[in-house]
């Protein structure tokens, strides 16, 4: 089981805050409340953050490094997308409450900020308004990712090179 530590260096989050879309629209006080729930973990290049079929446990934000999204079918893995600093992932499985449908692997040594399912549920109980803002932002992020996937499919249909 991966170790997670409390996020103590909040300044490191502030430097990438503009890239973290699901934290948009919250006040400083609300953001500080969210920051208290965040943890951090490191992953070496090639290490899996989460695997297809596992129960989702966290929403991840990339603080340093790059993460690849891999889709697999019968032992064939295809890189669907690469995520960079400030990007979040893991929210689809977490919100849909289904096991992971893809795997995420560190493309280079990476540091991830994480929001656990337990912390998200605690936020729902403690501050429903902040919880609702986060859920709306995550839904918006998922809609963007769905559009990205639609674009990939459309380009594939037309034989256009797809940039990951």
Model-derived regions, located:
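Cytosolic regulatory regions built on CNB/CRP/Popeye-like sensor folds
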Residues: 1-164
């Amino acid at each position: 089981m991966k170790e997670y530590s409390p996020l103590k260096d909040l300044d490191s989050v502030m430097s990438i805050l503009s890239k973290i879309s699901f934290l948009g629209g919250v006040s400083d006080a609300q953001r500080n409340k969210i920051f208290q729930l965040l943890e951090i973990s490191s992953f070496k290049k090639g290490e899996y953050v989460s695997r297809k079929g596992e129960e989702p446990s966290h929403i991840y934000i990339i603080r340093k490094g790059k993460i690849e999204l891999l889709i697999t079918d019968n032992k064939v893995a295809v890189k669907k997308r690469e995520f960079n600093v400030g990007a979040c992932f893991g929210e689809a499985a977490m919100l849909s409450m289904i096991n992971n449908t893809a795997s995420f692997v560190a493309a280079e040594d990476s540091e991830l900020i994480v929001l656990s399912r337990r912390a998200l549920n605690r936020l729902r109980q403690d501050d429903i308004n902040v919880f609702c803002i986060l859920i709306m932002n995550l839904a918006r992020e998922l809609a963007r990712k769905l559009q990205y996937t639609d674009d990939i499919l459309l380009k594939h249909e037309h034989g256009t090179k797809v940039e990951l």
